[in-house]
Structure formats: C-alpha cells, structure tokens
Amino acid sequence: MDTPDDLYYTDDHEWLRVENGTATVGITDFAQSELGDIVFVELEPEGTKLGQDDIFGTVEAVKTVSELYMPVGGTITAINTELELSPEVVNEDPYGDGWMIEIELAAPDEAEELMGADAYAEVT
C-alpha cells in the first residue's frame, strides 16, 4: 500500500494534506483497495462547515457504501467535481486526482493530533 510521508491519516482511512491554512482531504490507498471499484461519490457542498469526525460525504462501491469523516474541522472551500463523472479516479489515484474536498482549517492544530505515515502503516 502507498502511504505518502507528507500526509496526515485517520483511523477511518482518510488522509489530509495541509498547505498554508487549507487542507485537501481524500481516502487512502488502503481504503480504496478495501472498498473495491468505486462507482459513486457524494460530497457535501462548498461552504459547509463541519467539525472533526463529522460526515462530509459517502463513497459507493459495487458492494458497499462507506461514510467519509472529516479528519479535522473546517469549511469546505472546494469539491472535486471530476468525481461526479469519474468516481473510479479515487481507485486509480487516491492521493492525487482522486482528492475529494479542500477545506479551510478551523483549528490548524487539529492536524497534529492525526497519525503520520509510519503510525498509519502500522494500523493497515
């Protein structure tokens, strides 16, 4: 499994990339491989304010639906609209083109509470 060192990770298999007070969120390579072929992604709209661990969307695979949880609190500033037409991109490139939302961080320190790559690799 691919686990980039520059990201933060959650027990629920979301990743977070922090840059200049904003963050990009998606699901991990482990999560997409466990889900199988992703056929639909539904995300909360831009402007939605959510707390840490709140649900920001769902991912539907061939045999299951999984909720997506906010790794940190914040306001959604962008959603990956490409996933509406091509949800399989999450399977193909979970850390790149398969990103899901961008957020403005409510409390940047929350990211420090998440796992680094080594800790995440131990739980997967």
UniProtKB/Swiss-Prot annotation:
Transmembrane segments: none annotated. Belongs to the GcvH family. CDD domains: GCS_H (cd06848). The keyword Protein transport does not apply. The glycine cleavage system catalyzes the degradation of glycine. The H protein shuttles the methylamine group of glycine from the P protein to the T protein. Binds 1 lipoyl cofactor covalently. It comes from Salinibacter ruber (strain DSM 13855 / M31). Coiled coil: none annotated. Its cofactor is (R)-lipoate. This is Glycine cleavage system H protein. PROSITE patterns: BIOTINYL_LIPOYL, LIPOYL. GO terms for cellular component: cytoplasm; glycine cleavage complex. SUPFAM superfamilies: Single hybrid motif. Keywords: Lipoyl. The modification N6-lipoyllysine is found at residue 63. Residues 22-104 form the Lipoyl-binding domain.
